[in-house]
Amino acid sequence: MPKTERRTFLLDFEKPLSELESRIHQIRDLAAENNVDVSEQIQQLEARADQLREEIFSTLTPAQRLQLARHPRRPSTLDYVQMMADEWFELHGDRGGSDDPALIGGVARFDGQPVMMLGHQKGRDTKDNVARNFGMPAPGGYRKAMRLMDHANRFGMPILTFIDTPGAWAGLEAEKLGQGEAIAFNLREMFSLDVPIICTVIGEGGSGGALGIGVGDRVLMLKNSVYTVATPEACAAILWKDAGKSEQAAAALKITAEDLKSLEIIDEIVPEPASCAHADPIGAAQLLKAAIQDNLQALLKLTPERRRELRYQRFRKIGVFLESS
């Protein structure tokens, strides 16, 4: 989608920058209509816009990062697939009677290499979000994902997963259909796959819903994505009986890419364009593609046995604790 369309939804902290950019466009249009040279003034305003952009996006709080991760115009799995893959053929169904639209996947050609690309898929508007259950997969979604990963393993195709979900569907029907079992099965099986697995958090990485496709040789995060055991709203409601304290919870949960890199939960932070992924989706896709290419080339040099061993050790070492003296 064009950048202008992605600017129609503004977060509060983006508004000063948007107003300045609108002013620059107005001056440029008026100057063109009246054949007036305002290049010096435009240059000064653009310098101010660059400075303001840096001030805004370099000092974001965890709660503001969460807003960006949930931005309705933020690129989705399908957006990245379309921008990064040379070819794409979607595969459907879990072979158990369902085809969950909240988790999509298919065979693609990435940088000349056949791969399996799969991930959570949110909607673009209310109707689409309802159809895709707001990116919250049912058990069938995780079983479909595992079927596709088994297929990739059988044919020697690397697996690229894209994580963007507030969590797995927590409805009664999901529990009846074995939500916990479906996610646990994926966790176990992903450790045993021979092919390289690269997982990227592109928006929200919520709880077990994220982990269900999140066991990889490399786990990447876009700079303004989040990865958390529970949404800050849920955490605040549980700890303080007040969902209004979500901002406090967001800070305590350590949900940002920088926090998770320091804790060695993730391997790499993928930078975003100056105005973030929702404002420049093509730029974001180029940066992500380069990061995946580098990691994939490194992983392809390892034997399957070595990849499995390192993958297992990577997750075994997660977590720290303090001992009293």
UniProtKB/Swiss-Prot annotation:
GO terms for molecular function: acetyl-CoA carboxylase activity; ATP binding; carboxyl- or carbamoyltransferase activity. The keyword Transferase applies. It is found in: Cytoplasm. PROSITE patterns: COA_CT_CTER. Its EC number is 2.1.3.15. It comes from the Bacteria. Residues 44-298 form the CoA carboxyltransferase C-terminal domain. It catalyses: N(6)-carboxybiotinyl-L-lysyl-[protein] + acetyl-CoA = N(6)-biotinyl-L-lysyl-[protein] + malonyl-CoA. Keywords: ATP-binding, Cytoplasm, Fatty acid biosynthesis, Fatty acid metabolism, Lipid biosynthesis, Lipid metabolism, Nucleotide-binding, Transferase. Pathway: Lipid metabolism; malonyl-CoA biosynthesis; malonyl-CoA from acetyl-CoA: step 1/1. Acetyl-CoA carboxylase is a heterohexamer composed of biotin carboxyl carrier protein (AccB), biotin carboxylase (AccC) and two subunits each of ACCase subunit alpha (AccA) and ACCase subunit beta (AccD). Component of the acetyl coenzyme A carboxylase (ACC) complex. First, biotin carboxylase catalyzes the carboxylation of biotin on its carrier protein (BCCP) and then the CO(2) group is transferred by the carboxyltransferase to acetyl-CoA to form malonyl-CoA. HAMAP family: AcetylCoA_CT_alpha. This is Acetyl-coenzyme A carboxylase carboxyl transferase subunit alpha. The lineage of its organism: Bacteria, Bacillati, Cyanobacteriota, Cyanophyceae, Oscillatoriophycideae.
